[in-house]
Amino acid sequence: MFKISLNRVHDRVEIKEGDEKIMLRVDSDPMRMVAGLSQAQKMLQELNKDSSDEETDKAALFFATVIFGKEQAETLVAFYHNDAACVINVCGQYFSKRLGKLITNAQKKMK
């Protein structure tokens, strides 16, 4: 006998800034994001005051891509006019409020 359990996340994430807003969709298994999130964390931790804009932008785009997918990550970056700090902030908030607990719970179930 076996058990199949899905831990998929199906979210619509609405982001508002002033009068502008965008809607991003998340349809993914958080456990499949773990490797990408680890890489994003490493890239973000390596950033410092001497990091180039290119390094910062690359880390922000990668983080957003892991969570939202490539096309929507590019939409998010464009929405914030290439402001990496805003992109990182949005991704971090979504991760901490939604994905972090799901990943932790799924990892506990696997043990």
Show where each model-derived region lies.
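Short acidic, glycine/tyrosine-flanked loop/strand segments centered on an H-E-D-like triad
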Residues: A40, F68-E71
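C-terminal charged interaction modules
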Residues: K70-K111
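Short, charged/polar N-terminal "headpieces" of proteins
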Residues: M1-E46, N105-K111
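Charged, low-complexity interaction regions
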Residues: N48-S52
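Contiguous, amphipathic alpha-helical segments that mediate oligomerization or scaffolding
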Residues: E54-A59
